[in-house]
Curated annotation (Swiss-Prot):
Involved in the biosynthesis of the central metabolite phospho-alpha-D-ribosyl-1-pyrophosphate (PRPP) via the transfer of pyrophosphoryl group from ATP to 1-hydroxyl of ribose-5-phosphate (Rib-5-P). Binds 1 Mg(2+) ion per subunit. Mg(2+) binds at H136. It comes from Streptococcus pyogenes serotype M6 (strain ATCC BAA-946 / MGAS10394). Homohexamer. Gene3D superfamilies: 3.40.50.2020. GO terms for cellular component: cytoplasm; ribose phosphate diphosphokinase complex. The keyword NAD does not apply. This is Putative ribose-phosphate pyrophosphokinase 2. The keyword Transcription does not apply. It holds the Pfam family Pribosyltran_N. GO terms for biological process: 5-phosphoribose 1-diphosphate biosynthetic process; purine nucleotide biosynthetic process; ribonucleoside monophosphate biosynthetic process. HAMAP family: RibP_PPkinase_B.
């Protein structure tokens, strides 16, 4: 069992979106979750009560702003306000999944940049720091005027696949869209494997007509993306890989939302295993071939390093021989 962390000035609180990962983070850090309650009135209003003193403490609030996105975001904002009014020393938020991060630019005329709006709201509420996991767009860090620590899951995935023997020239890491090339290359470098990209014509209404840049024939393919939402991107990419001669297809994503009937879509796709982290707690049905890989140890280590003013850089690399990164 993890020993109790000695510094009592640091406190962790979990809101309601993803209690399981919060409990794992607390256990890994050796810090018990603080006592608080959150309830919703019949008209939808949220009431929060912090049931212990936080005066002078460094607070870390754990909350994924996943479905229901707006309820979870407002619960977070209200908790931040409660901590500020209770004279906390610092208020830091831990977002295993950062909702609205996909709305990071104006793609069509008169569209908002909602990721920036959310950043403004959180900053105005009084937070001192953000710890998050695999932002959809890394430039969202620049929407904040406070420190943002964007942790990467690729080292976790690399360790998993290395243990499974999925590495080397017999494996190809595939980005199912051209915007994910950097992510695919990062995993491929860890695995010492080549990369491939699935691209589509400008009109991609028939997405199964995509073509592959790179060689996948006779290789085991690993599809990688940051968010698994409806599952269509992975399902369509897996069919293209199968037609192109890939022997087996695996898929990995940082955040498993499994929305809009994703289980049904993915269960008919030629994918051997799907790996996601536990950044999102979903009530939707999950395919039987899904494996959850916990990001709790990574987040817990980041929290402790931040509190102790130690560098986070060792967390951004994978040491296959278990070297000590301290």
């Amino acid at each position: 069992m993890t020993e109790r962390y000695a510094d009592k000035q640091i406190k962790l609180f979990s809101l309601t979106s993803n209690l399981p990962i919060a409990e794992k983070i607390a256990k890994a850090a050796g810090i018990p979750l603080g006592k608080m309650s959150s309830r919703q009135f019949s008209d939808g209003e949220i009431m929060i009560n912090i049931e212990e003193t936080v005066r002078g403490d460094d607070i870390y609030i754990i909350q994924s702003t996943s479905f229901p996105v707006n309820d979870n975001l407002w619960e977070l904002l209200i908790m931040i306000d409660a901590c500020k009014r209770a004279s906390a020393n610092t208020v830091n938020i831990v977002l295993p999944y950062f909702g609205y991060s996909r709305q990071d630019r104006v793609a069509k005329p008169r569209e908002p940049i909602t990721a920036k709006l959310v950043a403004n709201m959180l900053t105005k509420a009084g937070i001192d720091r953000v710890v998050t996991l695999d932002l959809h767009a890394v430039q969202v860090q620049g929407f904040f005027d406070i420190p943002v620590d964007n942790l990467f899951t690729v080292p976790l995935f690399a360790e998993r696949y290395s243990k499974l023997g999925l590495s080397g020239s017999d494996v190809v890491v595939v980005s199912p869209k051209n915007s994910g090339i950097k992510r695919a290359r990062s995993l491929a470098e860890y695995l010492d494997s080549p990369i491939a990209i699935i691209d589509y014509a400008q009109d991609d209404s028939e997405r199964e007509q995509g073509y592959i840049i790179g060689d996948v024939s006779g290789k085991k393919a690993i599809l990688i993306d940051d968010i698994l939402n409806t599952g269509k991107t992975f399902a369509e990419a897996a069919k293209i890989l199968e037609r192109s001669g890939a022997t087996d297809t695996y898929a990995v994503a940082s955040h498993g939302l499994f929305a809009g009937g994703a289980a049904e879509v993915l269960e008919t796709a030629p994918i051997k295993e799907i790996i996601v982290t536990d950044s999102v707690k979903t009530k939707n049905r999950v395919p039987e071939n899904v494996t959850y890989l916990s990001a709790s140890d990574l987040i817990a280590e980041a929290i402790i390093r931040i509190h102790e003013r130690r560098p986070l850089s060792p967390l951004f690399s994978y040491q296959p021989k278990g070297k000590n990164n301290a």
